[in-house]
Structures are given as structure tokens and as C-alpha cells.
Regions:
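ATP/NTP phosphate-donor binding region
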Residues: 1-104
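Short Gly/Thr/Asp-enriched flexible loops that form oxyanion-binding sites at enzyme active sites
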Residues: 113-126, 271
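C-terminal charged capping/lid subdomain of soluble metabolic enzymes
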Residues: 2-15, 303-427
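A glycine/threonine-rich phosphate-anchoring loop and its flanking beta-alpha core
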Residues: 122-221
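Short beta-strand/turn micro-motifs composed of small residues
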Residues: 52-53, 109, 166
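Solvent-exposed alpha-helices and their adjacent loops that cap or buttress functional pockets
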Residues: 18-20, 43-44, 97-100, 121, ...
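Short glycine/serine/threonine-rich phosphate/pyrophosphate-binding segments
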Residues: 59-61, 110-119, 137-140
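Active-site segments that bind and position negatively charged phosphate/pyrophosphate groups
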Residues: 214-356, 361-371
Length: 427
């Protein structure tokens, strides 16, 4: 990928922000596992490294360690997990303990493996590289990592990888569930960009059309390849990987996660926190996000069709009801995020004046639920609640109360100002 070209296009950006990112090299290609050592050496990546992987990711990356050794890298230090499915603070500390006397960390894998290395590298000020093994989520180029503390999902400040390497031979053979999860994470960008634009309209939140377009171009590329996602197809796997990387870079360029996520991510977080607090595996990130996206796309189109006129008022949230939906461990964070709450910044008269434009944006920039479901099914994505093991009760509470987990303007968060219930629009 030509990263400099991306930055050059954003020079003197009309949004007024100086756009930059820390990632220096992204190499996505067929059979480049054997060239990994050469790529890292050319990039100036330090030679004394810690390799972090699990048994599955190390197995599919045959030849990687040999390539590194041939290029003069010391790979004697390794942390190999049995099967890494979820990132925990204890694992971050394990990486930190072993990385203390090396100069760089190489994560071999995706998702949680990347996250624990991203945080540890940041906290120890070590160089960080990702050798990706599946196009499963959009966080490869992110400078934050998810964390759950007291059953509440927030983000760690972390480190963008200096180098990202992905061999399309490996990506194409990744488990279908992981490839489909990556597609599910990408379609969420429709709502991320929509709600970013709405926040700009209603409360003057910073918005950059050029950065948004980077995400939308990546999204369009992914959608054009929907029917190839589940195939052992290197071209589509590489293109989707590139789109996922661009989505992460867009977050760094914008200085926020708006280009990549909207209400659908927070709904997914609500479901995830509920399950983890009860010791239940919450499913892959992109799998949940895809289902939440489909639900909200249908709801938002119904809102735009049915609520042609609105009379917004000051926020009518029943706070006792909201607080009752969160556990004793979660409550302090919920209270903090809503003191003040985001709707304190919304002028009802301005919301009314903007409503026609909000409805237009929904209708013109977001595909219909029918079209989106068609794309997702072609890509092998989960589309139903039973696919992600979410009960009807958890579904409803997640949709009604997720927005209180963030200080962020979302369509779902302004529903109390409109005297409406999101559940009235899901069908």
C-alpha cells in the first residue's frame, strides 16, 4: 500500500486538521511470508524481538520464523498461547514481562493477539509489527485497543503498528467465520459515517469529508467482493484486508473512531459486556457488529420514513430506569459518562431544523436493510439474533440502553428527545 499517497491527498485539508499516522509500511501480497524478514529489515524494525502468537496462527504462518532468522532477527523469545480468543489485562502484563528486554514486538495473528501486543508495546515504548493471519476486523492500524474493566467495555490508548504484513495465501485460507466477521465489521461503516455527519450537523462535532471518503471507498471495495468473501480467493482476501487497514488508518487520521463505528458497535458492546459478566463467550466482534448494523439500518430507514415531522424537547430520559439496566460494577462508569450527558449539547430547535437533512442522509447514504442483508448473506455473515446467541430480552435492552455507555451523539441516543422508542422501529 502507498501510505505516502494517502497522506499527500490530505495535505492542506479543508477541515483544518493536520492528518497523520504512525504506520510506516503495509505489505499485502501473495507468498510474502518468506519475505517478512526482508521487509522488516528494510523498514528498520529492531532485530531483537518478541514473537507473540497462538498455536493456530503460528501453524498457518509456516516459514515466518525462518524468514526472520535469515534476515538477522533474534526470535528466541516467544509467547505462544493455546488459543487466544479474548484479550485480558493479565495477558497484556505477560507480554510486557517478556518484552521488557527486547526492542520490538511481532504479533502473529489478528484481533485479541494484536490488541494485547498493541497495548504492551505502547506502555513499554517498543516498536510493534502485525503479521496478520485473517481479515477479521478493522483494528489492524488502530492506535487504541478494547478493554473490559468492571464488566464495562472501554478503550486503552495503544500503539499503531509500525509495520503491517499480510500474506494473501494465508488470508484466503482463514476460517470462513473470521473472514465473514471482517465483512460484518466493514458494513458498520455505513452507520459510522452517517452518525458522524449527523453529529456535525446537530452539535458541530468535527467532521472531515476527505477522511470519511477514505472509509467509504474501502467499504465500496469490500461490498463489490461480497460473493467472494467465503471463497479461497487471494484477490478478494487481499482487497478486504486492505480495506480493513484503511478503516483503521482513517480513525487515526480523524483522531477519533467516528469513521469506523456508530451505534451498532455500542450495541455490540452492551451484548458483549452482559455475556462476559456471566462467563459466556460473546462471539467474534465483527459477527456481532454485523447483526447490530442490520438491525439498526432497518430501524433508521423506518424512522426516516415514519417520522417525517418531529417536535424535539429536552431529553426525557428516565435515569432511574437507565441505571437499573447496569450492574453495580458498571454503574460508576455509566454515571461518569452521563455527567454531563451528550444531549445537554443538543438544542431541540436545531435538531428540529436539521431533521429533514438527517432523514435525507439516512435514505441516500445507507443501503436498505434488504440490500444490506443480501450482501451479508453473500459474504457468509451472521444476520439473525440466534446466529450470535442473543435473546429477545438482551436484544431489546441492548437497543434501548447501549447509548448511555458512551458520551456520543447517536440516533438511538436522541430518541428520548423525540418521545420515541427505538424498538417501535425495528420492524
Amino acid at each position: 500500500m502507498n501510505l505516502q499517497n494517502t497522506l499527500d491527498k490530505l495535505k492542506n485539508c479543508p477541515c483544518g486538521k493536520v492528518h497523520t499516522f504512525d504506520t510506516e509500511v503495509v505489505e499485502i501480497g501473495s507468498g510474502i511470508t518468506a519475505k517478512t524478514g526482508e521487509i522488516l529489515a528494510a523498514a528498520g524494525f529492531p532485530k531483537k524481538v518478541l514473537i507473540v502468537a497462538d498455536n493456530n496462527t503460528l501453524r498457518v504462518s509456516a516459514g515466518l520464523l525462518e524468514s526472520l532468522e535469515a534476515a538477522g532477527f533474534d526470535v528466541s523469545k516467544k509467547l505462544i498461547y493455546n488459543d487466544m480468543k479474548y484479550a485480558k489485562i493479565e495477558q497484556v502484563r505477560e507480554v510486557e514481562a517478556l518484552a521488557a528486554d527486547v526492542d520490538g514486538v511481532i504479533s502473529v495473528g489478528t484481533g485479541s493477539l494484536n490488541d494485547i501486543c498493541r497495548v504492551a508495546s505502547f506502555e513499554l515504548d517498543k516498536k510493534f509489527c502485525i503479521f496478520a493471519t485473517a481479515p477479521s476486523m478493522d483494528g489492524f492500524a488502530s492506535d487504541t485497543a478494547p478493554r473490559i474493566v468492571n464488566d464495562f467495555k472501554t478503550s486503552w490508548q495503544a500503539r499503531q503498528p509500525m509495520v503491517i504484513i499480510a500474506d494473501t495465501k494465508i488470508l484466503a485460507k482463514a476460517p470462513i467465520e473470521l473472514k465473514s466477521a471482517g465483512f460484518g465489521d466493514m458494513v458498520a461503516k455505513y452507520l459510522g459515517i452517517l452518525e458522524w455527519r449527523i453529529a456535525n450537523l446537530v452539535i458541530d462535532e468535527y467532521y472531515c469529508p476527505a477522511v470519511a471518503q477514505i472509509t467509504l471507498d474501502a467499504l465500496e471495495k469490500c461490498c463489490s467482493l461480497a460473493d467472494k468473501v467465503t471463497a479461497d480467493d487471494e484477490e478478494s482476501a487481499g482487497a478486504i484486508m486492505e480495506a480493513l487497514v484503511l478503516s483503521g488508518l482513517a480513525m487515526k487520521l480523524a483522531g477519533c473512531s467516528r469513521p469506523a463505528s456508530g451505534a451498532e458497535h455500542v450495541v455490540s458492546h452492551y451484548w458483549e459486556c452482559y455475556k462476559l459478566a456471566r462467563g459466556i463467550w460473546p462471539e467474534f466482534h465483527g459477527k456481532k457488529v454485523g447483526v447490530a448494523t442490520l438491525v439498526l439500518v432497518r430501524a433508521y430507514h423506518n424512522i426516516a420514513e415514519r417520522m417525517t415531522e418531529v417536535e424535539p424537547t429536552a431529553d426525557k430520559t428516565n435515569w432511574d430506569d437507565v441505571y437499573a439496566q447496569f450492574s453495580e460494577k458498571q454503574l460508576p462508569e455509566v454515571i461518569k459518562l452521563n455527567s454531563p450527558t451528550i444531549t445537554d449539547k443538543i438544542d431541540p430547535a436545531r435538531l428540529k431544523a436539521c431533521w429533514g437533512e438527517i432523514c435525507r442522509l439516512i435514505k441516500e447514504t445507507v443501503p436498505t436493510a434488504e440490500k444490506l442483508e443480501e450482501l451479508m448473506l453473500a459474504a457468509g455473515c451472521a444476520t439473525k439474533l440466534e446466529d450470535i446467541h442473543v435473546s429477545d430480552e438482551l436484544y431489546a435492552t441492548g437497543l434501548r440502553y447501549h447509548a448511555y455507555m458512551r458520551y456520543r451523539l447517536l440516533i438511538t441516543r436522541i430518541m428520548p428527545m423525540l418521545g420515541a422508542d427505538i424498538m417501535d422501529f425495528v420492524e
